[in-house]
């Protein structure tokens, strides 16, 4: 929004032209989201406590989690609020990339909000019925996938980028819709499964978003894109604003979510952030890279699939409890140790993912 004001003011002083630079607006977007989160955080936490909107803890979970019962949840509202304000202020509202991301965050945030509402207000630990949650997620993801496919303006927007192979970028055609759908829904649920310990989900989310900010910037410049053999996507630089807003909002939330957590993000945060990462990966044509950089999310999801599959087929469990972070808790690892080690894994995987841009 301020881009248009700055464009007008540039007529009177050329100094305002600095607002036309994506990098400058990205930094301001990060700082805006961070400061808003830090400012609104205590107020939101106090409000959630007064409304008795506290975490519902399963009785069959680790005993160490029983002390978390009643901790304010739905803190994802803080994250979403910070992202929306930052993007609306510093993003180019004429960009379809911006509006796609706001739709993703808003729609999946609403699904998560309904789920959290049923859990904390109606005291239903299962929340929104799984079938309805999946239907709503699918509807939102398909709307996004169809929109992106039908409005694609250049071949690069529907290519599949394969890491390590510079000349392997097949055109997907209508398969793009299927891939986009599974990427967005899968990423949304993967982050949701990871959000089980204090700060466990938000830090990898911040790291992946920061990496995608760089990739979006490179994709928006023809010279960088050609040099790295990635699709040149004009206008994708506006995704940098969204990514840095996620980074700022995430760091602000981590201030209150770090162990021992004062607030949890709830499904309103995890479902929307996961979907956002998936949508960004689709927009910059890096779905496979998301699997690498978001390896912690993949690991958590695969552990659940293996656990359920093994129990149904063989009647035996592979892990003491799934997702896998609970397995390590039950092995005796203190919660902070599990969290920090998963963060370290995430740092390694994000750096590995970025390295693939050059290793082709």
From Swiss-Prot:
Catalytic activity: UDP-N-acetyl-alpha-D-muramoyl-L-alanyl-gamma-D-glutamyl-meso-2,6-diaminopimeloyl-D-alanyl-D-alanine + di-trans,octa-cis-undecaprenyl phosphate = di-trans,octa-cis-undecaprenyl diphospho-N-acetyl-alpha-D-muramoyl-L-alanyl-D-glutamyl-meso-2,6-diaminopimeloyl-D-alanyl-D-alanine + UMP
Enzyme Commission designation: 2.7.8.13
GO cellular component: plasma membrane
Cysteines paired by S-S bonds: none
Membrane topology (UniProt): Multi-pass membrane protein
Annotated coiled-coil segments of the chain: none
Alphabetical keyword list: Cell cycle, Cell division, Cell inner membrane, Cell membrane, Cell shape, Cell wall biogenesis/degradation, Magnesium, Membrane, Metal-binding, Peptidoglycan synthesis, Transferase, Transmembrane, Transmembrane helix
One Gene Ontology term from the biological process aspect of the record: peptidoglycan biosynthetic process
The keyword Nucleotidyltransferase appears for this protein: no
Segments traversing the membrane: 26-46, 74-94, 97-117, 132-152, 168-188, 199-219, 236-256, 263-283, 288-308, 338-358
Compartments, record wording: Cell inner membrane
UniProt cofactor(s): Mg(2+)
Pfam family for this entry, one: Glycos_transf_4
Role according to the record: Catalyzes the initial step of the lipid cycle reactions in the biosynthesis of the cell wall peptidoglycan: transfers peptidoglycan precursor phospho-MurNAc-pentapeptide from UDP-MurNAc-pentapeptide onto the lipid carrier undecaprenyl phosphate, yielding undecaprenyl-pyrophosphoryl-MurNAc-pentapeptide, known as lipid I.
Annotated protein name in UniProt: Phospho-N-acetylmuramoyl-pentapeptide-transferase
Originating species: Shewanella sp. (strain ANA-3)
Gene: mraY
């Amino acid at each position: 929004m301020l881009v248009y004001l700055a464009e007008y003011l540039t007529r009177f002083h050329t100094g305002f032209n600095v607002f036309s630079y994506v990098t400058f607006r990205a930094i301001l977007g990060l700082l805006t989201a961070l400061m808003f989160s830090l400012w609104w955080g205590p107020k939101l936490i106090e409000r959630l406590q007064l409304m008795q909107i506290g975490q519902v803890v399963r009785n069959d979970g680790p005993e160490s989690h029983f002390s978390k019962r009643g901790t304010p949840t739905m803190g994802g509202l803080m994250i979403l609020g910070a992202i929306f304000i930052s993007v609306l202020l510093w993003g180019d509202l004429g960009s379809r990339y911006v509006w796609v991301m706001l739709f993703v965050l808003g729609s999946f945030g609403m699904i998560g909000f309904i789920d959290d509402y049923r859990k904390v207000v109606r005291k239903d630990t299962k929340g929104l019925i799984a079938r309805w949650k999946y239907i709503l997620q699918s509807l939102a993801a398909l709307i996004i996938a169809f929109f992106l496919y039908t409005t694609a303006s250049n071949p690069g927007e529907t290519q599949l980028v394969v890491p390590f192979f510079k000349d392997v970028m097949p055109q997907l055609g209508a398969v793009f819709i299927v891939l986009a759908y599974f990427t967005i829904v899968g990423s949304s649920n993967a982050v949701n499964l990871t959000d089980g310990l204090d700060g466990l989900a938000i830090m990898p989310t911040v790291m992946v978003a920061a990496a995608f900010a760089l990739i979006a910037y490179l994709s928006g410049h023809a010279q960088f894109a050609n040099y790295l053999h990635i699709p040149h996507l004009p206008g994708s630089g506006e995704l940098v604003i969204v990514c840095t807003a996620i980074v700022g909002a995430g760091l602000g939330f981590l201030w209150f979510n770090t162990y021992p957590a004062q607030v949890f993000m709830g499904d309103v945060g995890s479902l929307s952030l996961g979907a956002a990462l998936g949508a960004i990966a689709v927009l910059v044509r890096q779905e496979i890279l998301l699997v690498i950089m978001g390896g912690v999310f993949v690991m958590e999801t695969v552990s659940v699939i293996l656990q359920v599959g093994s129990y149904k087929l063989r009647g035996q469990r592979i892990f003491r409890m799934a997702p896998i972070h609970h397995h390590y808790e039950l092995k005796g690892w203190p919660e902070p140790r599990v969290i920090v080690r998963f963060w370290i894994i995430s740092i390694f995987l994000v750096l590995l993912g970025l390295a693939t841009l050059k290793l082709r």
